[in-house]
């Protein structure tokens, strides 16, 4: 679905492509040198090749290799470049000067689906039912980037909580224990 084949997709191929883990290295040439990393289960499909050529990345396939598997590093690199370009062009036309500030990029795709759903529920984000993890992460990250934050107040509160060895979770569990007694 995202341009990378899974292990299940490759089971129908020839035996040389069926098992990417037996000593095979990444099939890509990065900046003129062959990538030495071990191959993962993501394959270098035509869609990925088209994406790389559109982004003008210095990646090419090694023609002497008999498989199309790429390492996890290059898989994540290609996905991140694709996602960054989408974000830059989709947010307010991409040329507004207010987006030029140095905002750290948070990868919410690393969170579990349940965590993303809890975030969506807490902030009452409107989405269509049945979103997959990637769509949910994109919706949440769009909202997350637009939340106004008073940095000074937030940092002061965080430092206070760290110094006092307390958190809201501790307070909730203590209050529930008091109710039980």
UniProtKB/Swiss-Prot annotation:
The keyword rRNA-binding does not apply. Its main location: nucleus. Residues 82-103 are annotated as: Disordered. A motif (Nuclear localization signal (NLS)) lies at residues 83-88. Residues 85-87 are annotated as: Important for DNA and phosphoinositide binding. GO terms for biological process: negative regulation of transcription by RNA polymerase II; regulation of DNA-templated transcription. It is found in: Nucleus, Nucleolus. It comes from the Eukaryota. One of its GO terms (cellular component) is histone deacetylase complex. A zinc finger (Atypical) spans 26-74. Belongs to the SAP30 family. Interacts with components of the histone deacetylase complex sin3a, hdac1 and hdac2. Binds histones and nucleosomes. PANTHER family: HISTONE DEACETYLASE COMPLEX SUBUNIT SAP30L, SAP30. The zinc-finger domain mediates direct interaction with DNA and phosphoinositol phosphates (phosphoinositol 3-phosphate, phosphoinositol 4-phosphate and phosphoinositol 5-phosphate). In vitro oxydation causes reversible disulfide bond formation between Cys residues in the zinc-finger domain and reversible loss of zinc ion binding. This is Histone deacetylase complex subunit SAP30L-B. It comes from Xenopus laevis (African clawed frog).
């Amino acid at each position: 679905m995202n341009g990378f084949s899974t292990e299940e997709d490759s089971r129908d191929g020839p035996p040389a492509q069926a098992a990417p883990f037996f000593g095979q290295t990444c099939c890509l040439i990065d900046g003129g040198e062959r990538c030495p990393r071990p191959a993962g289960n993501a394959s270098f499909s035509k869609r990925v090749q088209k994406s790389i050529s559109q982004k003008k990345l210095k990646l090419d396939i090694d023609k002497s290799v008999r498989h199309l598997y790429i390492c996890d590093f290059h898989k994540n690199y290609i996905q991140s470049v694709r996602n960054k370009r989408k974000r830059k062009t989709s947010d307010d036309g991409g040329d507004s000067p207010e987006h030029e500030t140095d905002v750290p990029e948070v990868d919410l795709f690393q969170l579990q689906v349940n965590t993303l759903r809890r975030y969506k529920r807490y902030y009452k984000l409107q989405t269509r039912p049945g979103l997959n993890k990637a769509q949910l992460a994109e919706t949440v990250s769009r909202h997350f980037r637009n939340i106004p934050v008073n940095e000074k107040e937030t940092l002061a509160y965080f430092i206070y909580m760290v110094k006092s060895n307390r958190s809201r979770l501790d307070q909730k569990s203590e209050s529930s224990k008091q109710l039980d007694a």
